Amino acid sequence: MFCVIYRSAKRDQTYLYVEKRDDFSRVPEELMKGFGTPQLAMLLPLDGRKQLVNADLEKVKTALKDQGYYLQLPPPPENLLKQHLEGEGKN
């Protein structure tokens, strides 16, 4: 199984995985509007892989089969102040 990964033109660190290059037919129109013009990031073989860097491999495969796409959102921002205070035992 291969997938094609596109970077969002509107949202930093947001990626859209689809099964075929330039085929967004199964991606909801509202999602595409919010995503912006997709920018090709890479073609990626999924078979034989044990993991992906920022996404759960099984969730990606399941989403591609069931809905035709997978949307990878950026990780939540770090709250450095909270981490610092917790490190000092303060809340």
Curated annotation (Swiss-Prot):
Domain YcgL: from-to ranges:
1-85
The superkingdom listed in its UniProt entry is: Bacteria
Which SUPFAM superfamilies does the entry mention?
YcgL-like
Family annotation (InterPro entries): YcgL-like_sf (IPR038068), YcgL_dom (IPR027354)
Give the signal sequence positions: none
Q: Tell me, what's a Pfam family for it?
A: YcgL
Q: Where are the transmembrane segments?
A: none
Alphabetized PROSITE patterns for the sequence: YCGL
UniProt-recorded name of the protein: YcgL domain-containing protein Ent638_2370
UniProt organism field: Enterobacter sp. (strain 638)
The record lists the lineage as: Bacteria, Pseudomonadati, Pseudomonadota, Gammaproteobacteria, Enterobacterales
